[in-house]
């Protein structure tokens, strides 16, 4: 994210920001003709402290909940692979996923978002290394710039055997 814009005087002293959703490494090479790099969803910013270190937290603003249409909720156990395509059917390419993964004995837990075109994004959490990774090397047209198709990762402190994620998937970014 680049060039965040924040607002002052938001209700309840909130700090709300949007940002340009692109990367200077490939911003001029995206495979579009008129539409280039949207803004992010509005998100609330806050600070938190762990072991004396202060961190910035970013979460989608609660007003986004008003945009939800239909909600589906499921609990299930996975040993190996499970396909949940029916849960996101009919979403026209935009949906939100909130999930809590409770790990029983795996060193790595992961999932894949994919579509009927063969495009896919893999996400994994390495429980031992405490690293979350996202692999977008097969996410569609990735050949427009050598810096786009990549595996990225970040350190994440999660609960002992639990990982909570909130994913906003759209069809235009």
Where are these regions (language model features)?
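Conserved blade-ending motifs and adjacent loop-strand segments that build the rim/top face
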Residues: 1-2
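Beta-rich accessory regions
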Residues: 5-173
């Amino acid at each position: 994210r680049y060039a965040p814009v924040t607002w002052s005087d938001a209700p309840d002293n909130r700090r709300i920001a949007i940002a340009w959703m692109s990367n200077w490494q490939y911003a001029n090479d995206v495979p579009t003709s008129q539409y280039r790099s949207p803004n992010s969803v509005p998100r609330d910013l806050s600070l938190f402290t762990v072991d004396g270190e202060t961190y910035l937290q970013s979460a989608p603003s609660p007003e986004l909940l008003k945009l939800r249409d239909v909600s589906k909720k499921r609990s299930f156990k996975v040993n190996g692979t499970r396909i949940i395509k029916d849960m996101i059917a009919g979403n026209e390419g935009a949906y939100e996923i909130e999930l809590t993964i409770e790990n029983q004995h795996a060193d790595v837990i992961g999932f894949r978002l994919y579509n009927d075109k063969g495009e896919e994004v893999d996400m994994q959490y390495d429980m031992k290394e405490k690293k979350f990774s996202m692999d977008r090397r097969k996410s569609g047209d990735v050949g427009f710039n050598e810096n786009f198709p990549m595996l990225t990762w970040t350190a994440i402190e999660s609960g002992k055997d639990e990982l909570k994620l909130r994913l906003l998937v759209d069809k235009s970014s």
